[in-house]
Amino acid sequence: MHLPPAAAVGLLLLLLPPPARVASRKPTMCQRCRALVDKFNQGMANTARKNFGGGNTAWEEKSLSKYEFSEIRLLEIMEGLCDSNDFECNQLLEQHEEQLEAWWQTLKKECPNLFEWFCVHTLKACCLPGTYGPDCQECQGGSQRPCSGNGHCDGDGSRQGDGSCQCHVGYKGPLCIDCMDGYFSLLRNETHSFCTACDESCKTCSGPTNKGCVECEVGWTRVEDACVDVDECAAETPPCSNVQYCENVNGSYTCEECDSTCVGCTGKGPANCKECISGYSKQKGECADIDECSLETKVCKKENENCYNTPGSFVCVCPEGFEEDRRCLCTDSRRRSGRGKSHTATLP
């Protein structure tokens, strides 16, 4: 049995395995703990003024202010920590609910930073900023300004990573205090380093202008005390093909296509053609279409034939009511009737 093409394609699609899903990266224990603490802190903020009358009476201070440290408030905060469908959040909360209650009841005043107490010291899931790894070692450059403030410490704030510096653009070195090629040191002392970009003409530099170049970038050359652009388009051998023209840009050049009417060119448009393609001629300084139908010598040779100009050429067409016959004549089809006679005009 032969299936029709559409049915065969449909059957093939049914048999193909479904596309593999790209596995999303699961949050780390530190990220989960931090998210839980953020929700807890938000819950504290949301309930901070609840059940307070806003006055200053002794009764409010004695009775209503008890809510601030109450288990009722804690319960309201806890109920808003995890969405019902967030399994990992609910699992983490269930495992450590008693510890959060203990912090609320007895440790809150002594250790007001819940993240530091819960995620760093209790669960040992995270590290303080500026430290990394299983033992929360200091990042390169110290915990106060890791990587000299010019990079990111690998594993910063987590129990992972190796503490190495991933430098920001413009910086290099193990502590991110040295400047990359294309940058120079605007400020540097024992604690700070600030690198800024060189002029575009410099590969390396000691200052912000083209006169501060130590080495010129490719496409630039030193003239006296500064790096200046090389005009590649002025080279003895042009860098572009015969059907292109060259445009110089800072540090480089581009090759652009000549106008479609040109045979070789020196710039953009039909006014910059070296020569014109067939069917075009120089008119008022640029290549323009030749109207062959207006020439003194007829280009359409057949009798009754009409000439129509086209860009770069022309067409010869028999008018309506005429047909082109085998003798290269335009025969009036309206007069080809009766007694086998054909009324045609013949060329001399």
From Swiss-Prot:
Pfam families: EGF_CA. Residues 1-22 form the signal peptide. PROSITE patterns: ASX_HYDROXYL, EGF_1, EGF_2, EGF_3, EGF_CA. One of its GO terms (molecular function) is calcium ion binding. Keywords: Calcium, Disulfide bond, EGF-like domain, Endoplasmic reticulum, Glycoprotein, Isomerase, Redox-active center, Repeat, Signal. FU repeats lie at residues 192-239, 252-299. It catalyses: Catalyzes the rearrangement of -S-S- bonds in proteins. A motif (CXXC) lies at residues 30-33, 262-265. It is an enzyme of class 5 (isomerase). Belongs to the CRELD family. This is Protein disulfide isomerase CRELD2. It comes from Cricetulus griseus (Chinese hamster). The lineage of its organism: Eukaryota, Metazoa, Chordata, Craniata, Vertebrata. The gene is CRELD2.
